[in-house]
Each structure stands twice: as C-alpha cells, then as structure tokens.
Amino acid sequence: MVRNNSTSIVDRYQSELLQPQKEIVKRLRAFIARRYPELTESLKWHVPIYSLNGKNLLGLQDFTAHVNLNFFRGAQLHDPRRILIGKGKYVRHVTFRSVADIDCSALKGFIDQAIQPI
C-alpha cells in the first residue's frame, strides 16, 4: 500500500476509535495493506478510503457497535452467497461486529473484483 502522510492521518483516526471498532479497523487495514499494496489509503469524508489510480474503491466506516467495509461499486460485484448488504444504486457493504466476523477469503474475492477496471 502506498504509505504517505494520509496513512499517518488514518493511523491517528484508528487510534481514536473505541473497541471493538479499533481492532476491527486495525485488522482490516492490515489485510488490505498486505494483500493490496497497490491501493492508496487516505482519509476522506472522515473515514479511511482506498483508491487505485485516483478512483475510490473501498471505505471503512465506524459506527457505535460495528464497522462497515463499503464497496463503492458493490452493486456490480458478483456475490452468489449474498454477503454484501445494501439496496442503493452503487454501494454495498459488509458489516463487522467483531474481529471474528472478518472472512479474509470472502473479502479477497470482493476486493479482487473491485480493483478490476469497469
């Protein structure tokens, strides 16, 4: 993952979260950084956003009791197990209430699709 000043800002964002959101965000960020080094991490709209070639692909959003991983083109992703949540025109998300909810193999499939050209 491209490491820059934005990543330091995201580190600060993460440090201010409460548990379990802090640990969920930490694990998701580590997975994305390790598996998708080509993505750029930044803080936009007060949440971590991942982009490729200037196009926003993913976002982490914390809530009181969970964290969502948003896929900005989620409606276009192949999801036969119906893991993705949402009914809007474009965005879909996966909700994590604990680190035990993180299924890296399913996420890999969605992120692999998301980074493909439209």
Regions found by a protein language model. Name each.
Residues 1-118:
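Charge-dense, helix-prone N-terminal extensions
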